[in-house]
Amino acid sequence: MIFIDACFRKETPYTPIWMMRQAGRYLSEYQESRKKAGSFLELCKNSDLATEVTLQPVEILGVDAAILFSDILVVPLEMGLNLEFIPKKGPHFLETITDLKSVESLKVGVYKQLNYVYDTISQTRQKLSKEKALIGFCGSPWTLATYMIEGEGSKSYAKSKKMLYSEPEVLKALLEKLSLELIEYLSLQIQAGVNAVMIFDSWASALEKEAYLEFSWDYLKKISKELKKRYAHIPVILFPKGIGAYLDSIDGEFDVFGVDWGTPLTAAKKILGGKYVLQGNLEPTRLYDKNALEEGVEKILKVMGNQGHIFNLGHGMLPDLPRENAKYLVQLVHAKTRR
């Protein structure tokens, strides 16, 4: 698999490409699958439809890897927090974590309940071309914790940070509990058939450096270290969004570092490129315009050259991006990097 070879810095015929949120609303096929499911959460839980959606961007765009269609919040959902998705607003938990008692009341061993995820993986792997990789994923402990404490997405993360500074032991108990679940959750994804795993730390930038390293990065390192110990042949990709200023403190046992669009690729390459393969980092809105897209691709390829790079966006696809430009991006990267 070209994608897996690239994760391990092996020679590839061209630079592989996939896109975060490549299965999404910009595809009419996705909209149809979502309509059939009835709701976003039901789409995640319906393995037949989730498989369909996972495969769509591979078939339509020609990307080199599929990423499992699911949501990072299925883990806290199964741990006992009722979840709803509010149209135009996003996820909302009906209960939140407020103290040690609420942390202790969370169910453990819920990775065993996520069979709908593993069924999607095994179905997708059966239908996916042997040349294409399937990526599994989860959210980072810190990012999941913020949703569980705030109850929804936040601009200030005030409740989460208040807990971090005034009751750090409560937050650490939650992060520890989540970490243990996530290690087993990703392990079962691997056993079900994924070829690589990725951890999304979407709200990494909410924390100052010292707090980030202690309350997020340390837990990411713990998870990736255990996974590499169990499955050395499976690449681990970490994507902590918005921590370009903290790159000099990044270390640990993983294979690929996801670079967001706000972090200069030159800096990431200089600091991390010798140790980790870099993934990224086209600004997603460049897909609105072909000239802007071409310019962005040119800049990235000039910095990264032929090895140690997986092409991706620096964040997720937007719902109204023109699909023909997404397809063009894949063709462009393949053509420009063919060795």
From Swiss-Prot:
<comment type="pathway">
    <text>Porphyrin-containing compound metabolism; protoporphyrin-IX biosynthesis; coproporphyrinogen-III from 5-aminolevulinate: step 4/4.</text>
</comment>
<feature type="binding site">
    <location>
        <position position="315"/>
    </location>
    <ligand>
        <name>substrate</name>
    </ligand>
</feature>
<dbReference type="InterPro" id="IPR006361">
    <property type="entry name" value="Uroporphyrinogen_deCO2ase_HemE"/>
</dbReference>
<keyword id="KW-0627">Porphyrin biosynthesis</keyword>
<protein>
    <recommendedName>
        <fullName>Uroporphyrinogen decarboxylase</fullName>
        <ecNumber>4.1.1.37</ecNumber>
    </recommendedName>
</protein>
<keyword id="KW-0210">Decarboxylase</keyword>
<feature type="binding site">
    <location>
        <position position="147"/>
    </location>
    <ligand>
        <name>substrate</name>
    </ligand>
</feature>
<keyword id="KW-0963">Cytoplasm</keyword>
<comment type="similarity">
    <text>Belongs to the uroporphyrinogen decarboxylase family.</text>
</comment>
<feature type="binding site">
    <location>
        <position position="202"/>
    </location>
    <ligand>
        <name>substrate</name>
    </ligand>
</feature>
<comment type="function">
    <text>Catalyzes the decarboxylation of four acetate groups of uroporphyrinogen-III to yield coproporphyrinogen-III.</text>
</comment>
<dbReference type="Pfam" id="PF01208">
    <property type="entry name" value="URO-D"/>
</dbReference>
<feature type="binding site">
    <location>
        <begin position="21"/>
        <end position="25"/>
    </location>
    <ligand>
        <name>substrate</name>
    </ligand>
</feature>
<comment type="subunit">
    <text>Homodimer.</text>
</comment>
<dbReference type="GO" id="GO:0019353">
    <property type="term" value="P:protoporphyrinogen IX biosynthetic process from glutamate"/>
</dbReference>
<keyword id="KW-0456">Lyase</keyword>
<dbReference type="InterPro" id="IPR000257">
    <property type="entry name" value="Uroporphyrinogen_deCOase"/>
</dbReference>
<dbReference type="InterPro" id="IPR038071">
    <property type="entry name" value="UROD/MetE-like_sf"/>
</dbReference>
<feature type="site" description="Transition state stabilizer">
    <location>
        <position position="71"/>
    </location>
</feature>
<feature type="binding site">
    <location>
        <position position="71"/>
    </location>
    <ligand>
        <name>substrate</name>
    </ligand>
</feature>
<dbReference type="GO" id="GO:0005829">
    <property type="term" value="C:cytosol"/>
</dbReference>
<dbReference type="GO" id="GO:0004853">
    <property type="term" value="F:uroporphyrinogen decarboxylase activity"/>
</dbReference>
<feature type="binding site">
    <location>
        <position position="40"/>
    </location>
    <ligand>
        <name>substrate</name>
    </ligand>
</feature>
